[in-house]
Structure formats: C-alpha cells, structure tokens
C-alpha cells in the first residue's frame, strides 16, 4: 500500500509537469548547460558509487536509490533521457562537471565553503546532521517501573555529561570530524580514511561512539538491525548539514531551474516519501 501510494504521487507529479516542457526552446537557455542538455536530449548525472541508499549498485527492483530517483524525475521534468555515472570523490564530481562529462551531481553531497568554490550548489533536497551510534555500556541504566529520569540521550550534544567515558571514531576530514573537533576537543577522537574502518573500531570496543551523518547511521541500522541491542542511535539535530546537487559554477539559469524543481518535490511531498522509503524502511536492502 505504501509503495502504491508513492508510485501514484510520483505519477501525478510527472503528469503535472510533463506538458509545459514540450514548449521549451533551446534559445531560452543560450549559454547555460541546459542548452547542451536539450540539444543532446540527455541529462548526465554523477552519483556517489559508495553511498547507499543514495545510489545502489545492482539494486532490487523498484529501489535504484534516492539520488537516482530524483535524477529520473528531473530528466522527466526536462523531457530528456537520463544517463547515470557512478563516481567516488568530490574531486571527480567537480572536475567532470567543469569539463562537461556530467551535467550535475546528485551524490548525497553535503555543502561547505571550500566545495562552493568549485561548484554551485542547489537548494538542499535533504537535511541531515552529525549523528552517532553510542555503546549502551557507557549510558546510565534504563529507568525501571514508573521511575522518570530527566536525562535522555537523543543527540551527540547529550554526551557532554559522560565526558570521561566517551571516545569517538569518525571518517577524516568530514563535517562530522570538524564538528567533533569543535564540540569535544578535549576527548579522544580517532579519525579514519573510511566510515567502515570507523565502525569497525566501535564494534571492536576501541571507542564508545561512532559518528557520521544521520542518514549514514539510519542506513547502517537498516542493514544491521541487530546493532540496536548494544548501541543507541543519536539522531537529534546538533548542526544542520545540507544535501544538495552540485552544478557548474555561475550557471544561474540551470541553478534556478533545478531549484524550482526541488521546491516542487518538497511541496508535493515526493521528497518526504523518498526519505521514508529508504531511511525508515529496509525493503531496499539486498
């Protein structure tokens, strides 16, 4: 039933916007990447090869990934075909956008000032936050019966009361790493080249809290629900992180077009449905 309702909403959205784009002319977009897209009748989108469920390699039917679904909707909106190009690093995304190998990137990509010097970011289509998976061993025992305690652990900020017990693992040079360095500079912070190594250090009891963005934590729990027995997810917002599309620099026509599209996805509830399908359910997990 949930899947049917989602498909119906998508169909209504596409039908609503399909007709006007038959009226577009390339001359309206002279000098913009949109002119090239309409000329070749194809939208080329870079996606993050290593970040499920934004992109899922060899996916289950009906679950290609959040970013692939958004890209397909945008291609339909423009009235062109879609080509997906899986890439790995921000450098690859920015260079391929600049050279024209891809038109834009939808890659579960968070914005920051340094990245903004190399690409133009769209309005965010998702919002995340630094989040954690903390060992229950260092938390106070659960209240019994009708006992009510004032301390609840909902976000990374709540760990400040356990400073002597907390140590962190995190992927190096990320917004999450920077957040920890500012918030918990006096506590042990171990940074690693990948999230998987950082998770392994939590599971090996080398640290007591793994830190990543909230979507990564939710994905980890969808794939490994048994983790909830020994670890508590801390998903409350401590700092907004914007997930945005990356586009060519100074292409205001292209950015304005995509921003309007994203606003309509938000207004019609399509993005809420996508977030629920991939981060609150595990039907996509292989």
Please annotate each region the language model reported.
Residues 2-13:
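Bacterial N-terminal signal peptides that target proteins for export
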Residues 27-31, 68-77, 136-157, 165-167, ...:
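Extended ligand-binding regions for polar small-molecule ligands
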Residues 68, 72-76, 91, 95, ...:
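Solvent-exposed, polar/charged alpha-helical surfaces in well-ordered, non-transmembrane soluble domains
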Residues 91, 109-118, 179-182, 199-239:
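A ligand-binding cleft/hinge motif common to bilobed small-molecule-binding domains
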Residues 27-109, 113, 117, 191:
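Extracytoplasmic small-molecule ligand-binding "clamshell" domains
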Residues 46-51, 86-90, 104-112, 135-136, ...:
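Beta->alpha turn/N-cap motifs
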Residues 49, 126-134, 139-141, 214-262, ...:
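Periplasmic-binding protein-like
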């Amino acid at each position: 039933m949930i899947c049917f309702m989602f498909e119906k909403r998508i169909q209504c959205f596409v039908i609503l916007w399909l007709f006007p784009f038959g009226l577009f002319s390339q001359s309206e977009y002279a000098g913009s990447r949109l002119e090239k897209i309409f000329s070749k009748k194809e939208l080329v989108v870079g996606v993050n090869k290593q970040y499920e469920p934004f992109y899922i390699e060899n996916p289950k039917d009906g679950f290609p990934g959040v970013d692939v679904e958004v890209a397909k909707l945008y291609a339909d909106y423009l009235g062109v075909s879609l080509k997906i190009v899986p890439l790995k690093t921000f450098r690859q995304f920015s260079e391929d956008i600049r050279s024209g190998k891809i038109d834009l990137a939808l890659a579960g990509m968070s914005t920051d000032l340094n990245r903004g010097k190399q690409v133009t970011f769209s309005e965010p289509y998702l919002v995340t936050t630094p989040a954690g998976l903390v060992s229950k061993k260092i938390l106070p025992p659960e209240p019994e019966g009708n006992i009510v305690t004032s301390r609840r652990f909902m976000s990374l900020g709540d760990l400040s009361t356990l400073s002597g017990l907390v140590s962190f693992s995190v992927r190096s040079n990320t917004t999450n790493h920077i957040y920890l360095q500012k918030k918990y500079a006096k506590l042990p912070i171990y940074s690693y080249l990948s999230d998987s190594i950082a998770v392994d250090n939590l599971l090996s009891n080398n640290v007591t809290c793994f830190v990543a963005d909230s979507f990564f934590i939710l994905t980890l729990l969808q794939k490994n629900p048994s983790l909830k027995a020994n670890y508590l997810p801390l998903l409350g917002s401590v700092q907004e992180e914007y997930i945005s599309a990356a586009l060519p620099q100074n292409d205001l026509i292209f950015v304005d077009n995509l921003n309007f599209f994203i606003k309509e996805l938000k207004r019609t509830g399509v993005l809420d449905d996508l977030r629920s399908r991939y981060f609150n359910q595990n039907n996509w997990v292989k």
